[in-house]
Amino acid sequence: MQNKVHVRKQDTVMVISGKDKGKIGEVLRVLPKSGKVVVKDVNVVTKHQKPSRENMQGGIIHVEAPIYSSKVMLYCTKCKSVTRINHKILDDGTKVRVCKKCGETF
């Protein structure tokens, strides 16, 4: 069963718990089966890469690892704070996400 993930790709989010608490970044990938998201420059892990045909050099690389979506919250760039969202239907029938604090659309 897939978990409901409240953020989408390219959303700006803030980490609200864990070792990276307070960091703001962009969602790179959403993994709905595991309920996790990959955020830019958050939860960076060190990976030891063996030399291969594609990467002749090998070495140590840094990659963003997934974190649970419950540890991130949507960040509104207009009011500069984390916020929950409302869903609003516009006159033309499209459904948009709206900041609860300032009314800005995402």
Swiss-Prot record:
Which superkingdom is the protein from?
Bacteria
Pfam families xrefs: KOW (PF00467), ribosomal_L24 (PF17136)
Q: What GO terms fall under cellular component here? A: ribonucleoprotein complex; ribosome
An example GO BP is:
translation
Signal sequence span is none
> Which InterPro entries does this UniProt record tie to the protein?
KOW, Rib_uL2_dom2, Ribosomal_uL24, Ribosomal_uL24_KOW, Translation_prot_SH3-like_sf
Mind listing the GO molecular function terms for this protein?
A: rRNA binding; structural constituent of ribosome
Keyword presence, Ribosomal protein? yes
Q: Which UniProt keywords apply?
A: Ribonucleoprotein, Ribosomal protein, RNA-binding, rRNA-binding
- Gene3D superfamilies attached to this UniProt entry: 2.30.30.30
Q: Which SMART domains match?
A: KOW
Homology family: Belongs to the universal ribosomal protein uL24 family.
Assembly with partners or alone: Part of the 50S ribosomal subunit.
Q: What does this protein do?
A: One of two assembly initiator proteins, it binds directly to the 5'-end of the 23S rRNA, where it nucleates assembly of the 50S subunit.
Q: What is this protein called?
A: Large ribosomal subunit protein uL24
Gene designation per UniProt: rplX
